[in-house]
Amino acid sequence: LIHISTGDVFRKNMSNNTDLGLLAKGFMEKGELVPDKVTVDMLKDEINNFMPCNGFIFDGFPRTTFQAKELDNLLFEKSLKIDLTIALNVDNNSLIDRLLERGKSSGRADDQSVEKINMRLQEYDNKTKPLIEYYNDQNKFYSINGIGSLEQIKSRIVEVIEDYNNDWR
C-alpha cells in the first residue's frame, strides 16, 4: 500500500511553486481549508504518479463529502475502492495545544494563531464532520482515541485494521 499524506502533497506542490501549490498556500496562510477542487486535483496527480499499485493509505484526505465522492469515482476508474476510514478523536483543547506546538517548529503561519486554529476547527465541524455519516452509512467508518503517545495511537489503528481484515476473511 502507498501512503499519501495530504500535508506532504501540499508541501511538495508549494515548494515546487506549482499553480495548485500556490493556490493552496494562500488559503492555508489565512487559516482556511484549501478548496475541494484544488485538493482533489493535487491528490489525483499524486495517485496517478503511483499507478499501478495495490492500494493507498490516505492521510488527511478526504475532508469533505465532495472530496470523498470524487475519490470514490477516481478509485473506481482504477478498480480500487475505499475499504475503511479511521478518524482520530481528539478534543479541541488538545488539538489547539498540538497545533501551537507544531507551529513553533514548523513555522506554519496557520499553526501559530489560536484565532486561525479556531477558524479551521469551525470549518472542520462544518465541512468534515458530514464525512462520518457518509462513511458510516457504508459501514466504513471507525473512530479511535487520538490522545496518547504515537505508539499507543498506532496500536489502536493497527487493531482496527486487523479487526477489519479478520472480519473479511
Spell out what each predicted region is.
Residues 1, 78-84, 136-141:
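Short glycine-/polar-rich loops that comprise or flank the Walker A/P-loop
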Residues 2-73, 77, 105, 115:
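ATP-dependent small-molecule kinase phosphotransfer cores
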Residues 7, 43, 57, 86, ...:
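Residue-level signature of catalytic and energy-coupling elements of molecular machines
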Residues 8-11, 62-66, 89-96, 149-150:
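Conserved nucleotide-binding/hydrolysis micro-motifs of P-loop NTPases
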Residues 26-27, 75-127:
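A glycine- and Lys/Arg-enriched "phosphate-lid" helix/loop adjacent to the NTP-binding pocket
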Residues 37, 61, 88, 114, ...:
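Conserved phosphate/pyrophosphate-binding and hydrolysis machinery centered on Walker-type P-loop NTPases
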Residues 68-69, 96-99, 154:
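Short, well-ordered secondary-structure micro-motifs
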Residues 122-169:
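NTP-dependent small-molecule kinase module
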